[in-house]
Amino acid sequence: MSLSSGACGGKGVDANPVETYDSGDEWDIGVGNLIIDLDADLEKDQQKLEMSGSKEVGIPAPNAVATLPDNIKFVTPVPGPQGKEGKSKSKRSKSGKDASKPTPGTSLFSPSEGAASKKEVQGRAGDGASAGGLVAAVAPKGSEKAAKASRSVAGSKKEKENSSSKGKKERSEGVGTCSEKDPGVLQPVPLGGRGSQYDGSAGMDTGTVEPLGSIAIEPGAALNPLGTKPEPEEGENECRPLKKVKSEKMESPVSTPAVLPLHLLVPVVNNDISSPCEQIMVRTRSVGVNTCDVALATEPECLGPCEPGTSVNLEGIVWQETEDGMLVVNVTWRNKTYVGTLLDCTRHDWAPPRFCDSPTSDLEMRNGRGRGKRMRPSSNTPVSEAAAASDSKGTSSSSKTRAGANSKGRRGSQNSSEHRPPASSTSEDVKASPSSANKRKSKPLSDMELNSSSEDSKGSKRVRTNSMGSATGPLPGTKVEPTLVDRNCPSPVLIDCPHPNCNKKYKHINGLKYHQAHAHTDDDSKPEADGDSEYGEEPALHADLSCNGAPVPQKGSLSPARSATPKVRLVEPHSPSPSSKFSTKGLCKKKLSGEGDTDPGALSNDGSDDGPSVMDETSNDAFDSLERKCMEKEKCKKPSSLKSEKIPSKSLKSARPIAPAIPPQQIYTFQTATFTAASPGSSSGLTTTVVQAMPNSPQLKPIQPKPTVMGEPFTVNPALTPAKDKKKKDKKKKDSSKELESPLTPGKVCRAEEGKSPFRDAAGDGIKVESLLNGSSESHQSRLASIKAEADKIYSFTDNAPSPSIGGSSRLDSTTPTQPLTPLHVVTQNGAEASSVKTNSPAYSDISDAGEDGEGKVDSAKSKDPEQLVKEGAKKTLFPPQPQSKDSPYYQGFESYYSPGYAQSSPGTLTSSSQAGMEGQPLKTKKDEEPESVEGKVKNDVCEEKKPELSNSSQQPSVIQQRPNMYMQSLYYNQYAYVPPYGYSDQSYHSHLLSTNTAYRQQYEEQQKRQSLEQQQQQQRGLDKKTEMGLKEREASLKEEWKQKPSIPPTLTKAPSLTDLVKSGPGKAKEPGTDPAKSVIIPKLDDSSKLPSQPPEGLKGKLGEASHLGKEASEAKTGTECGRQAEVDPILWYRQETESRMWTYVYPAKYSDIKSEDDRWKEERDRKLKEDRSRSKDSVPKEDGKESTSSDCKLPPSEESRLGSKEPRPSVHVPVSSPLTQHQSYIPYMHGYSYSQSYDPNHPSYRGMPAVMMQNYPGSYLPSSYSFSPYGSKVSGGEDADKARASPSVSCKASSESKALDILQQHASHYKSKSPTISDKNSQERDRGGCGVVGGGGSCGSVAGAGGTDRSADRPRTSPSQRLMSTHHHHHHLGYSLLPAQYNLPYAAGLSSTAIVASQQGSTPSLYPPPRR
């Protein structure tokens, strides 16, 4: 090339420029953008060059120009590669050409070296063309090259390689030139470097440079001292262009863009513009050839973006899912890894479908089979290329990026390619040839678009391309992702979208979550649903398949995946061992459970966090697969249990990306850290507690522990370890009756018996999941409950990021004593509610009871009570369970209520027991909804009896959990925010049940009587126990205060007197005026209180006038604590009375059950209110504060206020705002949950709620948030409840958000008054059963503190969460006050009803009454 000689003189430049220029035509054809931008200059240059080709050659500038043309040349082709890897490649080719010609490639790379500047300076004469061009700046070529260098960071390798065609040509020509040009600087290094660049860089380019876009240039620069020998380069380059051409699949498309900038730079940097332009033209021509090469390269493998309908298999790691359903994935496509690619989860099969437990396992599976799978799934070149390029670059760079975060995602996605194609389409192709293909088609659109757009900036994404390459490396960085993957992997069971019209099934709760959040109405995820449904049809098989990436192959791969797991987990090969065990013995889930679980579980448990994590992941992965397989194979107890576990696994899996916005727990970064620290710490690093938790979880919580553990692992591998350990242990327990297992054994028995039928149904009803989601199938409900509970737990964990141990450890480990409880609940949730109870008996009898109770098993009276609470809660959450499945990612609303609420209500123990209980509740709800509907009342009674026990047991854990709850409160709040919907729902149910169910009505009337007593007591408590009038006055003033504080209507003060309440009711109505939803809610609460069966109560008499408002007022009064709840609840009830009735019709059994439970818990609440009043007497001076304090919401004033929990809970409508504001990301979950539970556009509660909003926030997120706040406050406030009650003002003022705290507390008190929080005994029972463990946890917990120091001591600890959760489950489930909160939602919109309410209610105290439902 003359260009090179240009350094010496430019004679060569003239000649070669002409040559290059000759290529100019081609170049024109090849590169349109460059031509467009450079056209004028190039034409000028062309004319100049043609007119005086060697005229300027003598000038050093012409050399630079010539070099610049070279640059332009590569730049021209480069445009394709530049933006993207393809561009980079294209560019590289051109760069190489350039380098070889004038050695501009050298300068291009040189700049990276630093030699570029020298060369540039020198090269101004000749080398500058190449060196200067790269350096950027000095000469047009310099700047062009600099631009190119920057662009070519990834493109440089392409320049190098692609330069082979033209570059080689030019290099061969310019070898001498290059040498001439860069004799001192460029040539010596460049020659050797270039040889290296093209030789070593050839491999490096593909493997290293491509994956590492920026590094590519540097290696290029280093190698590209390029002076290297253009000739060797040429030889190499010629070969390389072919190779590189392939590599540069998308060079052409990107080529144009890259060219433009370079071309622009060229004109800008044209020191020797006249010459440079000419030479640029010349060079451009040569580049034209390269462009042709690039085009060829692009055409075969690297064609432009795929057509819209094209089904593309992408291998990628899902880093997180955004709340709007976008998956942030590192995808490898066409041998290029795009790091920030966004995929629409609803339109593509995405990571959640990747059920591989461990990202590592996914990676490894992808490695051994994953890569093959990748190739297999993508029968098209992209797969092969991905396999090849992914392997090569995965090896070099994948281990870097992927090691950090992709290990899990990409391989995992491939591993669970069946279900995870969205993230890793390629892998999914195998699984979803039909559905995956469909999804792929959708995904390719988005993915391709993303890739097209991302490829420019995502050259480095390739790093993640090789999920296998990074199998080992990615593990660390992937730890978070692994959690995600693990979470995703563990949930092979498809989760059906609870949405009535939605048939979508999500392998991942993430998918469901995102789907619910934004795809509720669209079936974009349908492909995934198809895959899922495929999976759902064959839950076990597909679960195994999904979980392990391939049915049997995945099992076989599972071992690799497991192998990857060990990498990720850092666990001993044991992980792989379980992996192979699970893989090999996946079919023998039982046996595997015994072996793998024991081995992995014990190993994991006994091992370190990492060990357990590995084991968990392995266990989870294997267990998921095995569970699913076993479930499929053995749809017996064990299969049922496994199924349950599986479902939780799935939930976890789904939840894992839960972080999506905050991807499953993993996505929750803080959760990852928290769970890693807190979970492991809380859980004794999850190892110690996990071991216990695992035993516990195996007892009854394989699912719960799994979710818990999974939740933690979800957040952190350690957390995952508990989940897996739990799962393993669970399986262990199932397989072997060990001490830990003994609970599980009973759980297993129960599970086998009850869980078996529901979970077997779930297993058998993989499809039933849909029904379950719809609440149609009890078995599905159980399953969904398990999944939701798990996901919820996971989500709770996520929400509980502050105290991962609460979410995972606390549920699992935090409450070691209650851990069995948690496991029990998990088991309960697993569908072995009764068995769960049995399982629970060992360490967590109470919560265990909850699970059992749902099953109607009295095996554990204590356990049964909690179980019943769980069951009742589940019933209340009957819809929520459905939504849970749907919102599973979002906290599955109610699941959050009860399951997460429990776990989250108590930072440590309560979390385990509460969450376990809550989870059990969902299971119960699902499982027992049908049975429980009938036996709901009886069971409720039993539950009431047992609830005190559970309460006591729960309370202790609650205490443990309360501390963690402080920091977990925000999470808890989010989770607990769901509780209000529960209570509200319960109120809705309540109203319906009151009207439809005589028994329930009686119970409710009793509750209301108690509430009346509570109100009286609260009145007394306000002024004196018997100073009702004084209290009324106080409440009136409080009411006014609250009114002043928009949100705090008389609810708080109202408790004293029905009349006051009636006043309160109107006041509340007015307050609801402030809080649009509030007035509605007030009627609802009123409705709840009043309802047909309410009239008998004295409250009812007054309600006669203000019937709903009056009832609401009376309810509000019924417990200033509970009064707020009751108050809001009655309004909500009123509003939801219609909805409730509708729900009753829709789910009459559930509603009757819930209502009876509601009645029970109301009675309990009355009792509790009495207790609270007595306890509140110390708080009497400050009825508000007292109520707030007694409301548990106040307990963790700072936290609750911080979470706006007080607000959220206090104002069911308004509360939505606060929790939403505080936890907007979670709000969608709660929202969706409530919505899922019972979104009736016709229902008054939903009146103001746009259906779309509801769909977006399936569980009435706002209300959920609101609900959670109380839980959180109650949980953390369990201990603070006493303080708050003793010194309400102190509690309130203790937190900067004392207002919110007050609101929360008032909500809690409201719930107390509404739920049997006040009544110590019944209250506990009812709180557990009726008040809702979550609700009870919040308001009961507060009651325990305010109205029941006893309770605070006993109940508030665990019970607050659980009790509150149950009550709230009932209330929220009935009244869906959350939906009323969604009334606020309309104005609060996506934000937070609570936040809006908070602003409306100016003063938090005011918030209390309205929030109270």
Swiss-Prot record:
Induction, as annotated: Down-regulated by ZNF608. Isoform 2 is up-regulated during neuronal differentiation.
Protein keywords: Activator, Developmental protein, Isopeptide bond, Metal-binding, Myogenesis, Nucleus, Phosphoprotein, Transcription, Transcription regulation, Ubl conjugation, Zinc, Zinc-finger
Residues forming coiled coils: none
UniProt-recorded Gene Ontology molecular function terms: DNA-binding transcription factor activity, RNA polymerase II-specific; promoter-specific chromatin binding; zinc ion binding
Biased composition (Gly residues): 1330-1348
Taxonomy, superkingdom: Eukaryota
GO CC annotations on file: nucleoplasm; nucleus
Extent of Basic residues compositional bias: 725-735
Compositionally skewed regions (Low complexity) per UniProt: 386-405
Tissues expressing this chain: Expressed in myoblasts. Expressed in neurons in various brain regions, including striatum, prefrontal cortex, olfactory bulb, midbrain, cerebellum and hippocampus. Expressed in neural stem cells (at protein level). Expressed in thymocytes.
Positions of modified residues (Phosphoserine): 358, 361, 379, 413, 433, 446, 452, 467, 470, 533, 575, 577, 742, 757, 803, 841, 845, 848, 1057
Intracellular or extracellular location(s): Nucleus
Function: Transcription factor, which activates RAG1, and possibly RAG2, transcription. Through the regulation of RAG1/2 expression, may regulate thymocyte maturation. Along with NIPBL and the multiprotein complex Integrator, promotes cortical neuron migration during brain development by regulating the transcription of crucial genes in this process. Preferentially binds promoters containing paused RNA polymerase II. Up-regulates the expression of SEMA3A, NRP1, PLXND1 and GABBR2 genes, among others.
Assembly and oligomerization: Interacts (via N-terminus) with NIPBL. Interacts with the multiprotein complex Integrator.
Protein's recorded name: Zinc finger protein 609
